[in-house]
């Protein structure tokens, strides 16, 4: 089909992203898909502008035993006067009330331009009816340049603060590949679904920055003061030349894995056993000079174990445990409106561990699940000397409930809730040990429903309620950020015009135009605040040919 879906949204944002797909040749063996998108204009936030250009083409060919596919795309994403996040300065003892969700306290000159070229190639060959080999390759070439002016609030009552110019450039090259073989067989009464695979990944990162933290300008969250774009002062913290960024990171990962899922007890018990060997080489380098800041080379063979018991045709019980070698966090240039002593330095790799156990039930169009899980990773933070480092761990233990399905004809439900205990452990400080991790709520939930209106053929209405509990904006848990609720609604209408299927969609997010802090935190140890989007309208139409 060919889709021609014009779109329009709040603030004059509009676009027309056609999507064309066709199959050719005997038995439709060859396929092509072309997608382009041009969107631009204002947003629901005052004076904020966004423009997106996207083009991608996909080709595939298939025979009885072979499948080949390739995709290539380009994206150009431009933002102007994007509303910044909000950092709380040291000494602030409370969290400011969020501003009007449509207000914009950003300076007139911040922007971000990002361009990405991406592509994939994949081939599969059915060697026998029970064995398939595959190979895949992917790449991404990205370039970004921006000029930012994030607000640092020094008085929570008045929300007075400052902004400073912070410019960045980034170029990165990502290459990844995979070779594998999978198949099925039986040994006696035991079924096997086995796999062997090799993966590799390479990231070459080049960055430069200029942060004029000493030349701050007054601003206010509620009553902003706007300034012309300042020139950089002599005290600017500089990392390389913005027009010629140098290598600041090089990551290489190779991985070899084998696994087998055994089917036992007449396929009621599934047991998965796996091993993965990883080798991780990481280098981080000072922007501009290229001096080595840290180099790590680590390898590890890690297990993966899982089991599923089909207690009945409707009920399954499962558990799994996975380990993996993971790259450490990388220090950002500034933190808390001040430069870091080891900007762009990577921390040591670590072994991540994840445990999960749960139940799933599905019958008569209704499904539900419950799971408990636990994960841990080193705790990264910025110490008193503005050094990005690690001490202790962040431990996440949680319970997740989900429900989905069609309880009655024409009514679809989808919902979930998560209770999470996220603690900092073994931090070496009584002020933070046992405290909650920045930005993680103890409870969050989403409930959505879609209803096909019986009296109007083709019309469906939907609604969604999102709840996020309170969070903390600092390691010591003295800055509590209130929780929030949001209501989103929408409608979809399907009809035929001149024999063509026409789909009309309308959506309103944040119906009540609630002001709230949507998220807290970002890079590890940071508690910056992000204002939630205002009431936003979106309309679209698509025609299939």
Task: Report each predicted region and the residues it spans.
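Membrane-embedded beta-barrel scaffold of Gram-negative outer-membrane proteins
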Residues: 122-126, 132-138, 142-150, 317-318, ...
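Transmembrane beta-barrel strands of outer-membrane/channel proteins
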Residues: 4-8, 18, 34-40, 70-76, ...
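Conserved C-terminal beta-signal and adjacent last beta-strands/turns
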Residues: 170, 194, 319, 355, ...
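Repeated loop/turn-to-beta-strand initiation elements of outer-membrane beta-barrel proteins
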Residues: 28-30, 65-68, 130-133, 189, ...
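Gram-negative outer-membrane beta-barrel transporters
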Residues: 266, 367, 372-376, 389-475, ...
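Transmembrane beta-barrel wall of Gram-negative outer-membrane proteins
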Residues: 9-84, 109-132, 276
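Surface-exposed extracellular loop regions of Gram-negative outer-membrane beta-barrel proteins
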Residues: 78-92, 202-206, 295, 304, ...
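Face-selective signature of the C-terminal outer-membrane beta-barrel domain
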Residues: 120-142, 164-285
């Amino acid at each position: 089909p060919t889709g021609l879906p014009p779109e329009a949204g709040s603030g004059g944002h509009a676009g027309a992203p056609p999507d064309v797909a066709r199959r050719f040749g005997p038995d439709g063996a060859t396929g092509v898909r072309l997608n382009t998108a041009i969107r631009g204009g204002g947003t629901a936030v005052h004076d904020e502008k966004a423009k997106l250009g996207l083009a991608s083409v996909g080709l595939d060919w298939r025979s009885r035993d072979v499948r080949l596919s390739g995709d290539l795309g380009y994206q150009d994403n431009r933002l102007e006067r994007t509303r910044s996040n909000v950092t709380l300065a040291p000494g602030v003892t409370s969290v400011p009330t969020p501003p009007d969700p449509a207000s914009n306290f950003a300076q007139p000159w911040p922007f971000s331009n990002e361009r990405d070229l991406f592509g994939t190639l994949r081939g599969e060959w059915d060697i026998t009816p029970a064995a398939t080999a595959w190979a895949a390759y992917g790449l991404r070439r990205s370039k970004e340049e921006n000029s930012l002016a994030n607000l640092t609030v020094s008085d929570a009552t008045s929300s007075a603060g400052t902004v400073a110019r912070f410019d960045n450039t980034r170029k990165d090259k990502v290459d990844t590949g995979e070779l594998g073989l999978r198949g099925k067989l039986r040994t006696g009464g035991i079924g096997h679904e086995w796999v062997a695979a090799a993966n590799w990944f390479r990231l070459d990162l080049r960055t430069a920055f200029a942060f004029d933290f000493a030349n701050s300008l007054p601003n206010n969250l509620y009553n902003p003061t706007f300034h012309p774009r300042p020139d950089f002062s002599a005290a600017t913290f500089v990392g390389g030349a913005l027009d010629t960024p140098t290598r600041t990171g090089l990551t290489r990962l190779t991985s070899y894995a084998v696994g087998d899922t055994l089917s036992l007890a007449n396929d009621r018990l599934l047991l998965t056993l796996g091993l993965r060997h990883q080798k991780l080489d990481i280098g981080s380098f000072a922007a501009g000079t290229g001096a080595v800041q840290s180099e790590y080379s680590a390898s590890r063979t890690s297990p993966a174990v899982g089991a599923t018991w089909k207690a009945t045709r409707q009920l399954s019980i499962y558990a799994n445990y996975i380990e993996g070698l993971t790259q450490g966090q990388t220090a950002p240039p500034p933190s808390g409106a001040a430069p870091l002593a080891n900007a762009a330095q990577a921390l040591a790799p670590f072994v991540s561990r994840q445990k999960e156990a749960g139940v799933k039930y599905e019958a008569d169009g209704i499904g539900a699940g419950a799971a408990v899980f636990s994960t841990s990773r080193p705790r990264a933070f910025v110490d008193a000397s503005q050094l990005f480092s690690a001490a202790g761990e962040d431990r996440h233990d949680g319970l997740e409930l989900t429900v989905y399905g069609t309880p009655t004809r024409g009514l679809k439900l989808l919902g979930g809730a998560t209770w999470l205990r996220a603690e900092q452990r073994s931090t070496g400080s009584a002020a933070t040990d046992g405290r909650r991790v920045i930005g993680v709520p103890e409870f969050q939930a989403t409930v959505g429903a879609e209803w096909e209106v019986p009296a109007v053929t083709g019309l469906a209405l939907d609604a969604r309620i999102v709840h996020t509990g309170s969070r903390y904006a600092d390691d010591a848990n003295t800055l509590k950020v209130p929780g929030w609720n949001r209501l989103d609604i929408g409608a979809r209408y399907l009809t035929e015009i001149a024999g063509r299927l026409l789909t009309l969609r309308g959506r309103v997010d944040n119906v009540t135009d609630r002001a709230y802090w949507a998220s807290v935190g970002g890079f590890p140890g940071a508690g910056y605040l992000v204002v939630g989007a205002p009431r936003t309208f979106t309309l679209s139409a698509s025609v299939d040919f």
